[in-house]
Design a protein with these regions (language model features):
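Glycan-recognition surfaces
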Residues: 141, 189-283
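Active-site beta-loop-alpha junctions enriched in small/polar residues
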Residues: 39-41, 76, 117-121, 163-165, ...
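Aromatic-lined carbohydrate-binding/catalytic grooves of carbohydrate-active enzymes
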Residues: 54, 58-169
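Structural recognition of the beta-strand scaffold that forms the well-ordered cores
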Residues: 28, 32-38, 67-74, 111-116, ...
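Extracytoplasmic, non-cytosolic globular domains
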Residues: 156-157, 163-190, 194-198
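Bacterial Sec-dependent N-terminal signal peptides
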Residues: 1-21
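N-terminal module-boundary/linker segments of secreted carbohydrate-active enzymes
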Residues: 19-52, 57, 148, 190-191
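Second-shell loop/turn segments in exported
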Residues: 38-46, 88-91, 165-166, 264
């Protein structure tokens, strides 16, 4: 654990640096988002009941009061697009559609998140053989999907993956900027996460509130060390309202194939949590 101690010491020393003057923007603190996402635990096997139950538990267990305000529905809610290109939700998993999900989460005093891909198809369609994700990406449907997700359904956050975009060889900056512009026309307060599995570049600050800096995390110590190492020299690119995303946390998993690893020891989990906090990653 010398690696953990060394990194923690370095970051804590860095955190002691203070500024004597603050701009008006800096006086408004916009910390990294904190919440729950369905992907690690369920992948595409999600449902209306699962999401609502998780939201209830976040309130009951005190997570909401601790600042975990986002309930994010990841890949798996898609049904199909109709002849007009309108996205419909999965009839079995979400028979009542997605607006009731957002309304339910909002009713508990929290915010609701959603998922899409910058290309034609989602990661779940490729890695989990979820046929419903084929053609479900936002590519070619930006204004239409933005209105549906954030205007009609009322969601507050979106994770934008890149499996479909990568397959098509699309330009990342152009794609994410186009999506950002379409969302802004509906709701400028939507929080956007770029999930591109590497630091995208300085342009990301204008397109998103957070961005992944590495490949997917797995539930073993070597994977955590890799992610921390990737993020160690990226602190200059993060700041108030714009953060390096070290990926969803893998605490509580034991020998679970969905998160690829044997799981972390309690001490490793503590280090995991602490490092994500020290490095200002979304939780």
């Amino acid at each position: 654990y010398l690696f953990t101690v060394a990194v923690a010491s370095f970051m804590c020393i860095s955190c002691t640096k203070t500024q004597t003057t603050l701009s008006e923007n800096e006086k408004t603190v916009n910390p990294p988002i904190m919440g729950w996402s369905s992907w690690n635990a369920f992948r595409v096997d999600i449902s209306e009941d699962i999401i609502k139950h998780q939201a209830d538990l976040m309130v009951k267990k005190g997570l909401k009061d601790a600042g975990y305000h986002y309930v994010n529905v990841d890949d798996g809610y898609f049904g199909k697009r109709d002849d007009n290109g309108i996205m419909h939700t999965h009839e079995q998993r979400f028979p009542n559609g997605m607006k009731p999900i957002a309304d339910y989460v909002h009713g508990l005093g929290m915010k609701a998140g959603l998922y899409t891909d910058a290309g034609n198809s989602t990661c779940g369609s490729m890695w989990d053989n979820d046929a419903a994700g084929v053609g479900a990406g936002i590519y070619g449907h930006e204004p239409q999907d933005a209105q549906l997700y954030f205007g009609d359904w009322g969601f507050d956050f979106i994770k934008i993956d890149y499996c479909g975009g990568d397959v098509l060889g699309l330009n990342e900056k152009e794609r994410y900027t186009s999506i950002r512009n379409s969302i802004d026309k509906v709701n400028k307060d939507v929080s956007i996460n770029i999930c591109r599995w590497a630091f995208p570049g300085t342009w990301a600050k204008d397109a998103a509130t957070s961005w992944r800096i590495s490949g997917d995390i797995n539930a073993h110590w070597g994977s955590l060390r890799y992610v921390v190492g990737k993020n160690l020299y990226l602190s200059a690119y993060a700041g108030n309202g714009h953060y390096n995303d070290m990926d969803m946390m893998v605490i509580g998993f034991r020998n679970d194939s969905k998160v690829g690893g044997q799981g972390l020891t309690p001490t490793e989990e503590e280090a995991h949590f602490g490092l994500w906090c020290i490095m200002s990653s979304p939780l």
